[in-house]
Amino acid sequence: MTAEPNKPCQIKRDYQQLINLYPATADTDAHYLSKLSIYQQQVFEAHSQQKLLVLGQIGLGNGLELLSWWRTQANPSQRLLLKVFEPNPINAYELKSLWDQSLTLVKETPFEPHLESKQASALEFKSELCQLAQTLLNAEPTAIIGCQRLIFDDGRTTIDLHFGDIQTQLSSLSHSPMHPVQHWLILPHLLQALHHQSHWQMAKLSDDSATIATIGLSESSELSETTVNSFQACGFTVSDINELATKALGIHQPVTLINHQPDAVLLHERQVLRQQDAKAYAFNPMAAILSSATQSSIAIIGGGLASAHLALSLAERGQGAQVFCKDAELGQGASGNRQGAIYPLLTPENDELSRFFQQAFLFSRRRVQALTSATAVNQTPISHDFCGVLQTAHDERSQLRLDKIIQGQPWPSEIAYAVDAEQANAIAKINLDKPGFFYPLGGWVCPFEYADAAIQKAMQLADVSVSLNTDILAIERQADGWVLLTEKERFGPFAQLVLANGAELTQFDASNKLQISPFRGQVSHVPAQFQLSQLATVLCANGYLTPSHQGLHCLGASYVKEPEHLDFCPQEQQENLMKMHESYPNQSWLADIDMSGNNARVGVRMVTRDHFPMMGCAPDVPKILKDYAQHQLTKESRHYWQTTPAPVHQGLYILGGLGSRGLSSGPLAAECLAAQLCGEPIPLDKETLCKLNPNRMWLRKLLKGKAL
């Protein structure tokens, strides 16, 4: 059961503030709903040949248009990616309040005999929207800055919510050559708020024949002329939904939305803008896009959370994969723990690391919900409990750090909020007697069940196979792709190969120079008894303690760099216990922690110095060093590294370095790599993608003109 903060924390704005920030585009009567439906059907018909239709929407409004796009999608062979840009972040609680109080989705249209058929249709329309609205609310959109990716219907519908300054959000994204935005809808209350620079950023992200529609443009001649001229100067055609729908009703035929061939000069200016963007980030090469001829030619080495979720993200796109796991079962490495905490890593500055982990945590949480949904077909159970995570300090230094995080930002309460000692005791259901920071949407998940469920779903959706007991000892690059070798067998060639093999990530010649370190972690399993069994949330202090699952709590974990063995260690078992005593001294429930059974599990997690995971092209380190020798600390060297694609092993990719928070970061990192491989828009900004790149440690120095 999700632990919820108090309602006053969740809804900070009253209804009048909400309707001012998120106004309805028009009265939700039969007239508007009919026009909206006709217009959106026209968009889908105009782009019916697209396997993935990418649409952009400026403004969330009251959410009606978003839900209607979702509802209108009818082509079973077409996927929809809807990118919504909204300057004012909103969470699920406020969105529900807005809908409940405005009756947007439930109010009945006053009966008019001559509109009887339209009104009946409108009520049916609203009924369908209500179901989608509840599905959207269940996904828990939160009021954070940046992109939140919401995936529905096994990948058939994807909604990217980009919250924050629209110009900033638009400019932070890269053009997707294979799947650009085909059409934009701009809600009227934001027309004047868009600057000309924003128009150009929209053009950068768009197909050259992309069009724009808005509502009520013709009602203001001054606004109409100014807006249309600005968009036309960027190569767009602008249409009014009212006029499109009226024309369609009049001639009883679809109206084309591709009205003209943009001026060649304007298209060239768009291309220049894209090239400037690409040049600025040339040092961060993207994955080579899979062609239709190589649809089944991708291999993934690894049997844990990373490989499973990459297979799932690929499968949602219809892309098959072959997964190679050295163990007899999935999830036997770092993903083999009984319980793992899932919550975001926050920093006082809310920098790229903090923002990435918020996005990733929410994405992973939604994955768990989708895979365990009552409507999921042949679902594989995932033991989990979104009971919240309560972070407390364990000494003076950690208290100062936690205070900086709490006071550093006006954190959305659905992400985290401060609690006093009394509130902490009430949340935990055992006495802690100290204040903390509560993550209400967090909790714990069983990692190996999570990985297995992802693989099982992937196998339902696409041609995904798993080869167990297959220990890949070497990989070789040949003219026609990558070949995988065991002691006795040979697999391939594969056009693309992803290394997602956890602790063995650096075992191959092509990956052994990655700047990443193994850390041993021993997790203690202790019986649930007496006061301890009442624990109702995950505790994180000097170590962590989970609520009971199948009669056991998880207590951990040790942190030993470059371990010599993975055997049970009595000393680490006692250290885990002492960490709890240091964190919550003199509490009576500590006596209930019984370590006498020596029950524990040992695993290895791969950790990067900057705490970001690694996702992207495998760096060709010998070639980097060779180029460095030729461009060593000259005046031109920084420019060279800035504008030259960093050397990589073609067709080889890294997905790893998930550290101690792989449950939070792994699924989104996998989703981003799958999007790259399939040439689709990525739900991360350009700067964050650079932070994930496996070559970042070398490039960070080279871009600053420093010695390696």
Language-model segments: residues:
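N-terminal Rossmann-like FAD-binding beta1-loop-alpha1 element of flavoenzymes
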Residues: S296-V323
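Dinucleotide-binding Rossmann-like beta1-alpha1 core, especially the glycine-rich loop
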Residues: Q339-A426
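Flavin-dependent oxidoreductases
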Residues: R355, I475-R477, L485-M578, S583-N599
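S-adenosyl-L-methionine
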Residues: D100-S174
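Glycine-rich FAD pyrophosphate-binding loop
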Residues: E316-G336
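Helix-loop-beta segment of a Rossmann-like dinucleotide-binding subdomain
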Residues: V106, P348, Q379-Q391, A421-L461, ...
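Helical element adjacent to the flavin cofactor pocket in flavoenzyme catalytic cores
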Residues: F437-W482, T486-Q496, A500-N501
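C-terminal catalytic lobe of FAD-dependent flavoproteins
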Residues: L590-L708
